[in-house]
């Protein structure tokens, strides 16, 4: 009767409110990302660089995704020296790598492993984010850093196509470079190189 109808209405309203909140969060993320990219483009951001411990930064990123990893039954594996320092703006660079790790979560199934490794090279420092997910379609590989690019092959319907372009902009603002390597059905690897970290 009436009470049942009311229950249905209440749950519908709650569901709608939940969806609206999700949508608002999505729009807020979009606006924030757009503002950040625009400011980076305009050179309006002054990076506050300090010698940062890379292992500490990566552990913070792992912690940021710990809840999601548990929920989705995925694993983050960290590997690298505890004593490596990178001259960078910790907040900005953490956000860039965060976006790459989020991308790995968005494109992997339950049980996936996401590896974050870092090492010193003769010319600088390298950070790699690698997953064993669905991989990137060959048609998409050259477009993934384009703003608002949405793959027609992707199952991710919530993405806004700004996470990776923002990551690239931040890495390049640090004098770094990012490359992607992917095999369909096998996974994706993002390699970030920073030249001579003491002089970035």
What are these regions (language model features)?
Residues 12, 42-47, 85-88:
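Conserved micro-motifs of the catalytic ATP-binding
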Residues 22-27:
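Short alpha-helical segment of the dimerization/phosphotransfer core of two-component systems
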Residues 48-51, 70, 75-84:
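Conserved catalytic submotifs in the C-terminal HATPase_c
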Residues 54, 135-146:
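Short helix N-cap motif at coil->helix boundaries in the Bergerat
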Residues 104-105:
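Short helix-loop "hinge" at the ATP-lid/N-box region of the Bergerat-fold HATPase_c
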Residues 111-123:
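Short beta-strand/loop element within the Bergerat-fold HATPase_c
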Residues 175-176:
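Conserved glycine-rich
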């Amino acid at each position: 009767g009436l009470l049942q109808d009311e229950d249905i209405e209440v749950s519908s309203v709650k569901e709608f409110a939940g969806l609206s909140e999700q949508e608002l969060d999505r729009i807020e993320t979009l606006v924030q990302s757009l503002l950040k990219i625009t400011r980076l483009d305009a050179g309006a951001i002054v990076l506050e660089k300090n010698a940062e411990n890379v292992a500490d930064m990566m552990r913070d990123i792992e912690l940021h995704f710990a809840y999601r990893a548990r929920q989705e039954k995925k694993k983050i594996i960290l590997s690298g020296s505890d004593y490596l320092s990178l001259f960078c703006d910790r907040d900005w660079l953490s956000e860039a790598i965060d976006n790459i790790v989020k991308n790995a979560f968005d494109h992997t199934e339950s049980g996936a492993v996401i590896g974050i490794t870092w090492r010193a090279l003769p010319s600088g420092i390298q950070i790699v984010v690698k997953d064993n997910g669905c991989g990137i379609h060959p048609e998409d590989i050259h477009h993934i850093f384009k703003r608002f690019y949405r793959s027609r092959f992707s199952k991710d319907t919530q993405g806004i196509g700004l996470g990776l372009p923002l990551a690239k902009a931040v890495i390049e603002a640090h004098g770094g470079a990012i490359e992607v390597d992917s095999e369909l059905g096998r996974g994706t690897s993002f390699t970030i190189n920073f030249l001579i970290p003491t002089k970035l």
